[in-house]
Amino acid sequence: MSSTFFTCNCCVIQFKTSDLQRYHMKTEWHRYNLKRRIANLPPIGAEQFAEKLQISEKEQAENQVDEFGFPVLKPVMNQSNALPQKQKKPIKSKRGRKVGTNLLKRKDRDIAKEKQNRSVSPSGSISSQLSNLTVGTENTNTDYGEDTVSEYGFTSDSNYEYATSDEELDIADKPSDKENEKITITECIYCGKDNKEVERNVKHMFSEHGLFIPERSYLIDLNGLLEFLIKMIVIDHNCLCCNFHGSGLESIRAHMASKRHCRLPYETKEERQLFAPFYDFTYDDHSISKNLQNDRAITSKLSSVYGAKNDEEDGEVDITLVSSENDINANYTTVSIDESGLELTLPTGARLGHRAGQRYYRQNLPSQPNPNESRRTITAADRRMVSGVTEKQYKKGMKKMQQLEKNAINTQIRREIKRVNFQTHYRDELLQ
């Protein structure tokens, strides 16, 4: 009689009892094989999994970080400390022991002198905690060196000078003026390319990055607009289209390129007000007065044409609108008004009607047919008017036409009889 086994299909192993199988299901080896099975990979054995686990633990121990994300600095063992205790040769002779004690006493005297000098000198407050930790007696149980802090990964010689006053700290925190002068109005704001000229720079930003300057004809301060964009994007690292604030120049450039925000927001009233100092939408008084005079002349002419009850002039009335070259609507247009004063013909041939006749303009009346064409249609439909038809053929056609009419009437009668009982609440009085 064969004994029963409990099998794990994921790890391809067998167990004698169900308890062992349940315990196996909770192990990391089984979970790892489950993930491999989901990824369509074959399972691995326990020995191979143990090797992978040791490698991962070793990597984690080497790449340890503290709570702030900085790597944990481990002490570097000296060559003497790196050797095991068995390899160190013990001092057996009495002379050697005396030399060792003399060296320790001399070391203690040097340490005492150094402490005295530190207490007298004014630089005692600058001494770090690491220097205090390295000073110790022979009974101090430590693996670190006594004179340097190179065990922590630092060098004894430092190339940096520490700022001791508040003014030096403020100067160190403030960005240098050279960084602000890196971008000029001839350089691209979004990639930093130097185009040598302002107009070439604007064309480059429009073609490569999509920077469109709205209402360019009213722009009076292009250099000021570019300086404003440099201040907002390059110096302050702010996006004009959203509230994103970049950590640096490359950060804000990458954001604006990925989000397609290399443009000027000019849709709402608040956004237009932001760029208002660089535009001028006012006209000189001469052009304004000339436009008013032209408008009044056109209005009076049209009112006289539309309001006239009896037309004394023959032909059409031509109105020519010629404006000055400096006007915003500088063009030459000729329009024609018919005798009724309700239609205006454009140079393209299109006709514009007065709103008083919109009821008639909306009608879609069919055109009058040509009498010759209508006569031909009747002739083609009635074969009696065609030459060459005999009386016998005519009578035969009449009989056939009458038969078709009779069949159509009978079909209609049959359909009407069937539809009588289609009523919802129909009650036949004869059947009651």
Swiss-Prot record:
GO terms for cellular component: cytoplasm; preribosome, large subunit precursor. GO terms for biological process: ribosomal large subunit biogenesis. One of its GO terms (molecular function) is zinc ion binding. It comes from the Eukaryota. Residues 79-150 are annotated as: Disordered. Residues 105-117 have a biased composition (Basic and acidic residues). Pfam families: zf-C2H2_2. InterPro entries: ZN622/Rei1/Reh1_Znf-C2H2, Znf622/Rei1/Reh1. Residues 118-143 have a biased composition (Polar residues). The keyword Manganese does not apply. Keywords: Cytoplasm, Metal-binding, Repeat, Ribosome biogenesis, Zinc, Zinc-finger. Residues 86-98 have a biased composition (Basic residues). It is found in: Cytoplasm. A zinc finger (C2H2-type) spans 6-30, 186-209, 237-261. Belongs to the REI1 family. Present with 2240 molecules/cell in log phase SD medium. Associates with nascent pre-60S particles that have not yet entered the translating pool, and is released from mature 60S subunits. Interacts with pre-60S factors NMD3, LSG1, and TIF6. Pre-60S-associated cytoplasmic factor involved in the cytoplasmic maturation of the 60S subunit. May act redundantly with REI1 to directly promote a stabilizing structural rearrangement in cytoplasmic 60S subunit maturation independent on the REI1-specific ARX1 recycling. This is Cytoplasmic 60S subunit biogenesis factor REH1. The gene is REH1.
